[in-house]
């Protein structure tokens, strides 16, 4: 157990990948955690792997307001508090030029990547954080900081999430700190198409010589929900293996 033992976190989109890595890091330091995900079977497997004595799961779609309400209600019922929210649930269902982007698909991306994060933030604020404090971490992307060809809807949604982070940080202060993490390519099923069959080539572009893994983001989230970051809010922590260094100057 650590200094944070007894704290409670809600992590969305956490049955696998980055969300699971975040939940794993928080459980390891002594937190109790509620994880969400769309697939009930995958969620149960994740709960069992993380430890059913400290973790509960609530299945549903992140953009569904009824699911948001249920998840927050369940974590309050099970643990009596919700100190931390990590908005990780996201989608990137389309690849192609922005000129041909289906606007209905773009709306779906924004519903999941931005509006759901706002919905969960509102609900955790009213349920606990408004009176008791806490921290929120939004999982954004380097695609929200620099142009990312052929995944425009995803990139624009993550840019919006970064701005939402700043808005929430301003309005929720001083009780609640709100920050974002912007990963580059992390080895998950979600990002598999970006490196499958060419991982060595993809990794060579990174000054640190490898792609990210979920625990890299878990460590960053653990920092941003710890006392070590008590004077940090409204910021975006880029966790990118140094890929932005390649832009150079001039």
Language model feature labels by segment:
Residues 92-95, 146, 222, 233-250:
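Short C-terminal tail/terminal secondary-structure segment
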Residues 141:
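Residue(s) in the substrate-gating loop at a strand-loop-helix junction
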Residues 118, 180-183, 200-228, 232, ...:
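C-terminal helical subdomain
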Residues 96-98, 105-110, 191, 202:
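Substrate-binding pocket helix/loop in short-chain dehydrogenase/reductase
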Residues 126, 169-174, 230:
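Alpha-helical segment proximal to the catalytic Tyr-Lys
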Residues 121, 157, 165:
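Active-site helix of classical SDR
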Residues 15-17:
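Conserved glycine-rich cofactor-binding loop
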